[in-house]
Structures are given as structure tokens and as C-alpha cells.
Amino acid sequence: MTAKSVMVLGTTSNAGKSWLTTALCRYYARQGLKVAPYKSQNMSNNARVVVGGEIGSAQYFQALAARAVPDVRMNPLLLKPEKDTQSQVVLMGQVNAELSRMEWRGRSLSVWPVVARALDELLAENDVVVIEGAGSPAEINLKSCDIVNMRVALHANAACLLVTDIDRGGAFAHLYGTWAMLDKTEQQLIRGFVLNKFRGDASLLAPGPQMLQELTGVPTVATLPMWWQHGLPEEDGVFDDRSTAAGAVTQTVAVIAYPRISNLDEFQPLKNVPGVRLKWVRSPSELAGLGPADWVILPGSKATSADLAWLRAQGLDQAIAAHAGRGGAVLGICGGLQMLGEALIDPHGIDGNGPGLGLLPVVTVFDEAKTVQHRQAAFASVGGPWAGLSGVEVQGYEIHHGQTARHSAMAAAGDIACPVMPDGLAWQNAAGNVLGLYLHGMFEDPRVLQALFGAATPTLESVFDGLADYIGQHFEPGVLQSLIA
């Protein structure tokens, strides 16, 4: 079996590559074809656990849309930013310390055989491989070390779509400029232009698409209307004022947006809960007005100690403590759990030592070994605003360094943290309003949403099918089939 390959390129970051790739995966899978996604290199702190290690969340969801088992080959190189100039390198699912220390140009050249082999294997095993590029293929300063855009397209002989965000303005210039900066052999792979996030009367675009085709020979094959609530998380995006489901707002969920936040995509299901508003918080003023029914969430972090220092510098530590002191609900997930404790102890120099926020009487000791695994566990008796979780069994995943345990001195004094999941996976304070857990993905479990909100949200299957229906409606007739002919 030698697969046909379709590749989604973008004129910029956030043009719409990830969701369009996901939509194409489901579109072709619904035809009974064996489909796999692929992105050679992804830079994101949003990761998922699969057999063999971890991959970017976008490729994980794309695999589910393709009705395929997520596989490390679908995202063979994952870069997880730790600092502005430093990333942890995950190669074929596993952290590679040597590559993490390398200069990026040399690293890119050294890993090309690995990422190319992963693609070749997927091409050999499937009918269709839907490939996602990164950023723009016209970054001429990066082209000599490209392992994610046109080098991949040429290797796979992919039929390429070039998508642009028309809502930003300058869409035709973006499309023409990107196309013009490609080599002639690369230009020949571009099969269609896609105008994404369009608002208004599509007839007003004329004569733009026609003139663009005269200049390039490439037709505009789709104009996709703006669609805020397609149901997929932005790969590295944030919530905004549109992050409220239908109905009056009855509860606010405030997520602390520290610089190295990770796995933010796990909060996507909350955007669809009626009456719930999600918002990012970067300053104490944004927590003003929260009531006891409102939540503050400390999400995962790729640099727990550094993000905790940032949180303190903003004054958010005092604002969070004040909310908890009023009986307000506080939830920490993974790195957020570690921050909520009394102390972070780092004997191996992994993340840094320091005091925690002191809202849970627990202590975290960082390990050299990284825990990366799926977990299924049930909550024990849980109190406070989380009482609905009592006895609920949830599926999720762990990605972290470190283990958390009771603070022995505080326990001796009577301030006891209550373990509410086996193996130290989750802890609750005596008052019941502060909960911390290592398990990512809790809100993606319908049982959790039902227990906490009495609400059901759209299933992933319905989201994927909606995406496929959407592109089937808005692409020019026959285009999507011609890409795999």
C-alpha cells in the first residue's frame, strides 16, 4: 500500500492548518479509507500520551478524527519550550537530552532521517496521509534546515493546499507572496488556495481569486466562513470573550495563564458547558469579583518553579489565596498541583527549589525520571465544590517530573491533606475547596462534566463529523477527491 498524501500549508501561524488537517482526516476516513495524520515537527507544550511516549495534542486529535490509533510516528519530533531560547526535544515519543542541548540547525539536519522514515512507514501502511506544515513555507531564512514544510511535501509528493487567515487582512498578498517565494518544483505541488475565517458577502472577493489564479495558475478552492465554535482547541491559542456557551453566565472558570502553561487544550470541553465562561487570568484584577461558586484553575506548566515565580511577581499568589480563603474553589492540575503545596524540592536540578503557595499541605520532590502514562482511576470521597466527583472513575494521562506526598510536619500538627485518588494522584485540603491532581484530561470525560455541571457537551465524534461536513459544504465540488486521485 502506498498512500496518497495531502498537505496543509499556511501563509502564517494560526492560519487554520491544524483544524483543516483534522477535518480532512475525518472527511477521508468517512469514505472507508485508512487515514493517518503526520506533522514532522511540532512546537507546543500541549502533548498527549500514546503508545511509545508523547506527541503533540493536535496530531493526537487528528488521529482520532482519522479513526486511527495515535502513534509517535505521526509527530516524530516534538519541541516543548522551557525558556525563550530553550526547548525540551521529544524524538519518537521520548525525551532526548542530547538533542535538547544541540543548536537547532544541526539538530534539524540530524533528525531528518528519523522523521522521513516515520513518514515513509505511514505512507506504506495507509491509503491517505494528511500532512500538516508549520508556520509558513516561505521563511527563506529557515529553508536550508526545513524539515516540516516543503522538504516534507517534496518527499511525499503531496498535493498541497495553502491556507490563509483572511480576517487579518492582506490575504491575497499573503498567498501570492508565499507562492512566489517557493521554488518552481515546490510551486507545482500547490493545488489550491484556501481563504479561511471569512466574514461577509463572498461575492465581494471578486476579482481577487481570478487575478490570483492568472498570476499563479493556482485556483482558490474554498472560502471558509468564520467559525468560532468548531469544537477543537486552538493548538497554542487562548480563550477569549467568545469562550462562553449559550445562555446566561452562571459560573466563571478562571485559568491562570503563566508563561509556560501546558496542556491548555484539556479545558476545551468547558467552553461548551451552558452558563460557564472561561477566561485567562494574568493579573490580580482579573480575579476581582469572583464568588465562591467560581473556580480558579492552576493548569499544567513546563517550568513549574519559574511559572510559580512569575505568578508571585504578578501578585496572583495573594489573589488566589484570598479566593481560597473566602471558600472559593481552587483546582491545580499537574504543575498546578505542585504549586499549591508547601514546597518544591529539587535534588537533581530539574526545575528548582522553593516554597509553594501553601494551599495544600503536601510537598513535591522532583525526580529525574519523567512519568508519561495513561491512567484510569476513581475518586474517593471528595468534599466541597468537588463532591460530585465522589466515586467517579475517570480516564486521563500523566506527563510530569516529581512525586507529591503529605507534608509530615503539618500532618503531625493536624493539618492533613486528604488523598482522594490512589497512588498520590489527587489531594484535597481539609476545608474541601482546594483540589489538586496529576491527571490531565479530566474535563474530556463526559462523566466528570455530568458530575460537576449536570451537563453533557458535544462528543469528539460529533465535532469531527461536523468539521468534515463543513469542508464538504464549502470546498469547490470535486476538489477534495481530486487531491487523492
Curated annotation (Swiss-Prot):
Keywords: Cobalamin biosynthesis, Glutamine amidotransferase
Residue ranges of domain GATase cobBQ-type in the record: 250-448
SUPFAM superfamilies in alphabetical order: Class I glutamine amidotransferase-like, P-loop containing nucleoside triphosphate hydrolases
Location of the active site: C334, H440
GO molecular-function terms, A-Z: ABC-type vitamin B12 transporter activity; catalytic activity
GO biological process, alphabetically ordered: cobalamin biosynthetic process
InterPro entries for the chain: Class_I_gatase-like (IPR029062), CobQ/CobB/MinD/ParA_Nub-bd_dom (IPR002586), CobQ_GATase1 (IPR033949), CobQ_N (IPR047045), CobQ_synth (IPR004459), GATase_3 (IPR011698), P-loop_NTPase (IPR027417)
Signal peptide residue numbers: none
Transcription recorded as keyword: no
Keyword Nucleotide-binding included in the entry's annotation: no
Pathway: Cofactor biosynthesis; adenosylcobalamin biosynthesis
Protein family per UniProt: Belongs to the CobB/CobQ family. CobQ subfamily.
Matches recorded under PANTHER family: COBYRIC ACID SYNTHASE, DETHIOBIOTIN SYNTHETASE
Protein task: Catalyzes amidations at positions B, D, E, and G on adenosylcobyrinic A,C-diamide. NH(2) groups are provided by glutamine, and one molecule of ATP is hydrogenolyzed for each amidation.
Name recorded for this polypeptide: Cobyric acid synthase
Organism: Polaromonas naphthalenivorans (strain CJ2)
